[in-house]
């Protein structure tokens, strides 16, 4: 589960030749390399602080350059993936930020909005700041080319609904 943008302790998408290069250079076993890719990379590996973005955010605010670099990379990667999907889909009506970072880190959403500004995406800074800690709502400006929302994740509800649907088929 490494594909996509960088996660708390996972690399996200990377060039496969990097894996063998590092293994050979550092004399690592496949198991050791797997641990690095899945448990010691991502925000943790780059920041050197934590896999929890709240800790990385605090460190970046205190001037930790590695923590800031981790944020810069994460925001770039999120923007790149949104851009890639916009091309694949031929556009979209809305962008939705969800899950831990998407729901609770307004600064990441604001930076991603800046990356997407050339597409006409506009995030309202005041609305964006208000949409944290379980709040749900629209954060784009009225003249944005796409609507942008923050919607909290409810994985337990999805699991419960899927389980109910499966049980009803028995």
Where are these regions (language model features)?
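Glycine-rich phosphate-binding loops at beta-strand->alpha-helix junctions
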Residues: 93-115
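Enzymes that bind and transform nitrogen-containing heteroaromatic metabolites
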Residues: 120-133, 140
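Flexible, glycine/charged-enriched surface loops at secondary-structure junctions
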Residues: 30-34, 46-53, 85-92, 123-129
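Glycine-rich phosphate-binding loop plus the immediately following alpha-helix
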Residues: 1-51
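Structural signal for terminal/edge beta-strands and the immediately following C-terminal loop/tail
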Residues: 134-170
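Adenine-nucleotide phosphate-binding core of ATP-dependent small-molecule kinases
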Residues: 42-46, 53-88
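Hydrophobic alpha-helical scaffolding
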Residues: 5-12, 46, 68-71, 102, ...
């Amino acid at each position: 589960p490494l594909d996509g943008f960088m996660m708390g302790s996972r690399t996200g998408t990377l060039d496969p030749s990097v894996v063998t290069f590092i293994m050979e250079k550092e004399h690592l076993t496949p198991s050791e390399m797997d641990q690095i890719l899945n448990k010691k990379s991502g925000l943790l590996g780059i920041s050197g602080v934590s896999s929890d973005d709240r800790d990385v955010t605090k460190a970046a605010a205190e001037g930790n350059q590695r923590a800031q670099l981790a944020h810069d990379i994460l925001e770039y990667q999120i923007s790149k993936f949104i851009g890639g999907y916009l091309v694949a889909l031929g556009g979209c009506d809305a962008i939705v930020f969800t899950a831990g970072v998407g729901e609770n880190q307004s600064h990441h959403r604001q930076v991603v909005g800046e990356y997407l500004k050339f597409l006409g995406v506009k995030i309202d800074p005041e609305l964006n700041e208000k949409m944290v800690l379980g709040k749900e709502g629209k954060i784009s400006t009225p003249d944005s080319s796409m609507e942008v929302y923050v919607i909290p994740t409810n994985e337990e509800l999805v699991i419960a609904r899927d389980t109910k649907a499966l049980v009803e088929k028995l």
